[in-house]
Structure formats: structure tokens, C-alpha cells
Amino acid sequence: YTGFEDLNMQTYIVVSAEVLSRYVFRSDVAYDWNISMDELNEDTRKFKEDHLNTFSRKNDRLDWSYYPQEPSANDSENRNAYLHELGKITNRSRFVDGLNVDAPYTTTAHYWLIKQMVNADEWRMISDDDFSIRNAFYRVFTKELRLSDAHHFICQVNKTKSRKQCLKEFGQAKAELLDWGDIRGFKTKFLRTLASHYLTELLTSHQFHEEAISKDGERYRKYADNPIKHPLATKDKGFYSVDCRTDLSALEPNEIAKMLLNVNDHSTNSFIQQIRRYISSLERPLTTARGDKKSYIYANFNPKYAQFAITILRTYYNFCRPFKSADKKVLTPAQRLGITDKQFDWKDIIYFK
């Protein structure tokens, strides 16, 4: 389909994992393979979806929330615009069954299902500063956020850095932290311990929220958009910034420092890397040898089976694939989380051993 990629049919995958054990709770493809164009057309005719605001549409979760209808005498839409929209959706219907789902809708459902699955009194959420993620998290965990039982940390990474620059920043961060420890009189050379002391000292004066006064003269605290540089740079990302969008004023600096030390995106990045490595059908389109066109030889033409493949990989990743962590232990994510005390293999999963 020449020019079809210009329709921006990106299919998103929403992944959530536990930061310490790297256990992946869910991995959901933002796609509805059960919906058909006939159903969309029927809903549009029945509920007049093409004349409603987006928030009132039954199928607003889909990238095509209504099916184009021929304009009546009282419609403001002209026939040329109708034919243009009809041509686009007709071309889309010939491509693959089903329709893409908006990422915010999938993310909201994703978090809701995790909330039902995980029995927890307090929640600590780490993400980049993406509006759809923030909106979904705040909708699902409204009560917990209001009671300060949930906090949202932001991890921002500059992905334009070169590998060389990241390695340079990693060495720089290590040297700066050791120098700071010597100046403060700490005998330990353990970087994580020094980073904890550094953050505790910094947070005695640094605030992620600030006081403001409303029009009625009432004082309240608001997000200050005041991130800090994480003292522990990494080899693949270099320096990165951390922030918190929820109010932490009720906590002591050492408690906040302990949480900030764990703010990173390693757990989700690790699983996404496995998806790219083991499920070739989810790779991005490749540039052809001539460099002027795209080759979709590995493109994903069936999101339904992509979801199946990701779920199988997630099970293998959680229960069968061990990794070595800083504590020198080689365990699977499920073992680290305490779900099981053994490492499984494919036969255990296939035959339910």
C-alpha cells in the first residue's frame, strides 16, 4: 500500500514492571482485533457518531471512532471531504482486521487491571513525563493519590546522547560522588550509599512542590517542575533527571532519598529490549538497499498474534530467564518478587508442571 505508512498507524505497547525485581506485570498491545468496519458503520448510523463530540462517541477509544456517512442536505460537510474520508477508511479496512486503540485508553485499562491484580496499600509509579500515562495513572489511583498512598516519580532521559558521551558522564558521576564523599568525611566507597547520603543532604533544601496562594487567599502546594540530576549515572544513558509530581512534604529527606535512588527505567527497558530481540515481527520497518523506500518484511501485520507472542515472552521472561544483579544472585524476576522459589523452563510452562 503505497503511502499507507503516512496514515501514522503506529501500534503502541504499554508495559509495566516492578522496578527492583523487573517482574513484568502486564504488556498490552493498543489494538482491538474484535471490532469490524461493519460494526463501526452500524454504530455510526445508530448513534449518529459522526455528529457527536468525541467524549460522547461509543468507539472514541479507536483511532477511527466513526464511519464516514454520506452528507445529507443539512450537513456542513461537502461530498469531496466525505469521499476523501471514505477512501482513507476503505484503504485501511483492506490492510488488516481490527483497529488501533488510543494509547491513553489502553494505558487506563492497563493500570486498572494491575490495580485489581496486585494487593498493595501503597503505590510508587515511575514513568517519563508523558501526559497520557499521567492522566491514566491519576484516573485509576485517584483515591490513593488523595490520601498520599500513591506517588508518581518522573524519570527523564536525554536519548540524543552518543554512547561515548554516556560513558563519559558515567565516569564523571562516579568521580564526583567519590569526591563529595571524601569532602564530607565518609569512609565508604560504595556509590549507592554515598548517593543516598548526597540525596538526603540535597533534599533538606530542595523541594519538588512549592507553596502558592489562591484567589481566595488560601495556601496550597503545587507542582514546582523542579527536577534534580540523579547522582548515579548509567553507562547507557549517562546523567538523567528525576522529579516527583505528587507532594512528598509529609516524608523525611532520608525517606525521599531512598525512593529516588530507585527511580529509573531499567525494568521496562529490559523487557522492551527482549521484545525487539526475540519478536522480529515487531521491529520497525527497514530501509531498503537503495535507501529511498521502506521494507515491511518484518512488519507486524497481525496485532492479535503480536499480543499472544508478547504474553508468551513475558511469561518466559518472568519465570524462566534469570539475570545477575548487583547482589551477585542469579534469579528470575518471579523468584526475586517471591512468587516462586524455582527457575522454570519451557516444559514446565507447556505441560503445567
Residues of each region from the PLM?
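A short acidic (Asp/Glu
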Residues: 4-5, 38, 133-141
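Short amphipathic alpha-helical "interface-anchor" segments enriched in bulky aromatics
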Residues: 263-294
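C-terminal domain-tail junction helix/linker
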Residues: 215-219, 223-227, 234, 242-243, ...
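Inter-helix linker motif
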Residues: 145-168, 172
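RNase H-like nuclease fold core
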Residues: 1-120
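Intrinsically disordered, low-complexity acidic Ser/Thr-rich regulatory segments
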Residues: 64-119, 211-264, 293, 297-298
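Acidic/histidine-rich, metal-coordinating catalytic segments
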Residues: 111-137
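Short, conserved catalytic/metal-binding motifs centered on acidic residues
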Residues: 1-2, 22, 125-128, 269, ...
